[in-house]
Amino acid sequence: MDNNPNINECIPYNCLSNPEVEVLGGERIETGYTPIDISLSLTQFLLSEFVPGAGFVLGLVDIIWGIFGPSQWDAFLVQIEQLINQRIEEFARNQAISRLEGLSNLYQIYAESFREWEADPTNPALREEMRIQFNDMNSALTTAIPLLAVQNYQVPLLSVYVQAANLHLSVLRDVSVFGQRWGFDAATINSRYNDLTRLIGNYTDYAVRWYNTGLERVWGPDSRDWVRYNQFRRELTLTVLDIVALFSNYDSRRYPIRTVSQLTREIYTNPVLENFDGSFRGMAQRIEPEYRQPHLMDILNSISIYTDVHRGFNYWSGHQITTSPVGFSGPEFTFPLYGTYGNAAPPQRIAQTGLGIFRTLSSPLYRRIILGSGPNNQELFVLDGTEFSFASLTTNLPSTIYRQRGTVDSLDVIPPQDNSVPPRAGFSHRLSHVPMLSQAAGAVYTLRASLFLLLVLLIHARSIFNNIIPSSQITQSFKKIISWTSVVKGPGFTGGDILRRPSPGLISTLRVNITAPLSQRYRVRIRYAFTTNLQFLTSIDGRPINQGNFYATMSSGSNLQSGSFRTVGFTTPFNFSNGSSVFTLSAHVFNSGNEVYIDRIEFVPAEVTFEAEYDLERAQNGVNQLFTSSNQIGLKTDGTDYHIDQVSNLVECLSDEFCLDEKQELSEKVKHAKRLSDERNLLQDPNFRGINRQLDRGWRGSHDITIQGGDDVFKENYVTLLGTFDECYPTYLYQKIDQSKLKAYTSYQLRGYIEDSQDLEIYLIGYNAKQQTVNVPGTGSLWPVYAPKPIGKCGEPNRCAPHLEWNPDLDCSCRDGEKCAHHSLHFSIDIDVGCTDLNEDLGVWVIFKIKTEDGHARLGNLEFLEEKPLVGEALARVKRAEKKWRDKRVKLEWETNIVYKEAKESVDALFVNSQYDQLQADTNIAMIHAADKRVHSIREAYLPELSVIPGVNAAIFEELEGRIFTAFSLYDARNVIKNGDFNNGLSCWNVKGHVDVEEQNNQRSVLVVPEWEAEVSQEVRVCPGRGYFPRVTAYKEGYGEGCVTIHEIENNTDELKFSNCVEEEIYPNNTVTCNDYTVNQEEYGGAYTSRNRGYNEAPSVPADYASVYEEKSYTDGRRENPCEFNRGYRDYTGLPVGYVTKALEYFPETDKVWIEIGETEGTFIVDSVELLLMEE
């Protein structure tokens, strides 16, 4: 040190205000095993040991999950709390630490079980234990990770979130690789693999999003703000982004062997020099541009340092850097001068030695220089010297010292990644660049001379300088940019910057060094994102090797996310002709102005099966499994139409770039399979082109059924059946398989796929009725409940996105009449067909029905196909059932002849002639109902399972029922009173006072007049000169009389009076008295009541069926239909005792009469009022 009497004091650097050691609330992160140490160790482990197995599992235990306690997890939280100046509330902190502790305990059990299983992989008990441990671990992680994303604390919890996400992905990779050996079925393994690929994207995007949010939060205008901003960027790159950049390697089907990944991003240390108060005002905007712009990786060759002097003090005044490109040979590049040239001493050149500079020890110096008396002082803040240490895995290399060694150690902020070896071998980063910003500030009284802001820029130690391509691993290589190709900042999850090209042309070249024999063959894969379809061309040493079409992955203007990138390769393998070769990549056949991004180029040994090949192999196996032989002549019987659709989806989703020819060939085969499936399907219109389109063929159904186009579950049309509010009006769908299409003594099967259903009843009806009730509570969807269903760019279902696979173990087959188990996606029912007599035309009815309010169903891919000929016991059984059915038919015909004769006589008696166009004069409503009841005693007119389907006696029933309808119509035509039975309440009636219409227990609506001042009336138009029969059925309670009066404006009044009968009263014009009515009621079976002739097409059917060939005699009782009235008949109960029917003759003199109802005392109850026109 110079002896200068004007030097007042010297302040050591470690006494200066340093934002690095500022703490929140007095807390301080302890040195040693810090979150950065742990994250660096984990990243080094992931880069070097990324191979599934017990070694990887136990490695995670050793690094984190087996040694961490609450204090270590709390250190992760404190780290970000300090950086963003936000404390996590106690509840969120305790919840996070508790969850992490639980995961740690559970993973240690998982790891020990894994170790034991790997030592004895065929042991059934250990395989079962691994299944249990995996399910427990996966469930715990699925539950815990969302709790590490607490609202308002996403940033401070981010590093522990990433640690848990990394653990989850590793566990899912384990089951994807080893699940089959543990005993999981293929569908479960595929489902967990789909979870893995989905969560790689979800966890990546979440981490990058909240990293950027935190980074924006710590930005400020001054130099001290920038220091904290840079610290957040550096430390969360190490604890978050570096780990996230390796998430994609967990895709076990894309990276099935060891993969060499490289982190090419750069991070900055804290400024080696900064002014003593740490707050250059407004300097952040000047400092940030000094952060090196996006670039491809290069190698630091040398630093030439210049020395200047001020007031007798020598210091680092400037420097120049030279670098060499990585991945190709080229001239050394010299960067412009940082700072200023100095001539106080010769320039000192720090040359690259060994594995590069891994450590710097800098000596900053602050001096306050007193210039005489007064305030005119100077402050000098300079770098007095630096020692540069060189990395080596074997020996200690001598360091190079510029002037002198200092105390500011770069390892304090970026420590080694392996503390088990000396830092020269366990280093985590190498020096790649040294930017510098200098400033001299002046004032009237104060001079700050030559103040410097100097940063050390480092790149990860795993970055390899020479693009070595071995034979046993997947290598991700670096690139050289070409004119019109630029380097842009990576989106945060790529581990470095990426290439961008807006127009066609050459994108990149790289030199690769081959350590394997030149006979080794490779395939190229590219991780890319772009806004347009294009064509990639590749070549080696000028020799073209690949050409393929690639498709857009994102829309113009959208942000780069993990889902924007795809990794796709070429199908044609190649080999290198030289040990050092130049690989080139170019893009063509797209319009300028689009965005083309390249993240990395991968070289994969040709023997490795990766995702596109796996997809092709799976599609090929799926197509081949559809057929009975290699010549594709016939389909396998167990291959469903739904499964053919799913196989076609596999084919359609194959990569055009990778296997276009194979895709076209497989497409033709699967189309052939679909045509064969259609040919063997005996159902008409299985694709639901329409319902009720044709009367004599195809599907018939209720009007509330909807046909919908394909979705993520169904490739073709499917139907949706909704619930009903009345079981007598069910939702139904049916079709008949004609007898002519069936083979004698053959078994047939109905099958299909149900996306979800409740209370869906399925019937097959031939010689016997087969029923199945299926409930599938939404498990048919191919997407997890918590995951949104992916869609294409035009809103169509994206069937190529990861989803659940078809699982044959979920099939449900119901035989011999039993009900189907719940939660079945595939259903099937078998039915045996006997002799196919075309004269009988029995056929087979296929029925789907829902009769409950909560019922619903979505189903498709329906098939009815021949299964096998009946032989042996099955043949004998169906012949026995056939004989019983014929015996029943003979007996039914004999019974029907008798019942038909009686019913026809009752119907004929209603009319005056065989033309059935005029009723007998004395025909009343009771007689019509009585005849209707006898018509409905004809059995097997309609199927009891669904009353809209005609049975064997449908023709004669319809014949007589039509005449009953005619009788009702003729009766209505001659009864001129509207709503005389009060079935529609008080409609058409005028009311004064208080009256009610009540429905009584016998299902009759009656008018109740409870007060003497009340009156009900109706004006009726009549034909003057014609005769009418006023007829009233009523009941009087209590004292007094009930009166029904018919009158005109002037005189001509008649009335019917009702009282509580004590003695018989005879009215001159009455046709019925109190005593007479009982006889009349008995004659017609008590059928006289209000009627409902609505046509209901859907009865309810009990779900309990006898076994298939159980005897059921027609004479022992029919299968009753509780909705019998749906064809116009209702088994009305008789009138209660006390009701009286009275009538008289009336001849109006005008065209209007009034009917008035009233009473004098008590209550008057009126069942019906009629005014019947006399026949001429």
Curated annotation (Swiss-Prot):
Molecular function terms from GO: signaling receptor binding; toxin activity
Something else known: Toxic segment of the protein is located in the N-terminus. Encoded on an unnamed plasmid.
InterPro entries named in the record: Cry1Ac-like_dom-VII, Cry_V, Galactose-bd-like_sf, Pest_crys, Pest_crys_dom-III, Pest_crys_dom_I, Pest_crys_N_sf, Pest_cryst_cen_dom_sf
Any Pfam family hit: Cry1Ac_D5
Native source organism of the sequence: Bacillus thuringiensis
BP-aspect Gene Ontology terms: sporulation resulting in formation of a cellular spore; symbiont-mediated killing of host cell
Stated name of the protein: Pesticidal crystal protein Cry1Ag
Name of the encoding gene: cry1Ag
PANTHER family to which the protein is assigned, alphabetical: ENDOTOXIN_N DOMAIN-CONTAINING PROTEIN-RELATED (PTHR37003), PESTICIDAL CRYSTAL PROTEIN N-TERMINAL DOMAIN-CONTAINING PROTEIN (PTHR37003:SF2)
Record family assignment: Belongs to the delta endotoxin family.
Alphabetical keyword list: Plasmid, Sporulation, Toxin, Virulence
Role noted for this protein: Promotes colloidosmotic lysis by binding to the midgut epithelial cells of many lepidopteran larvae.
UniProt entry tagged with the keyword Glycoprotein: no
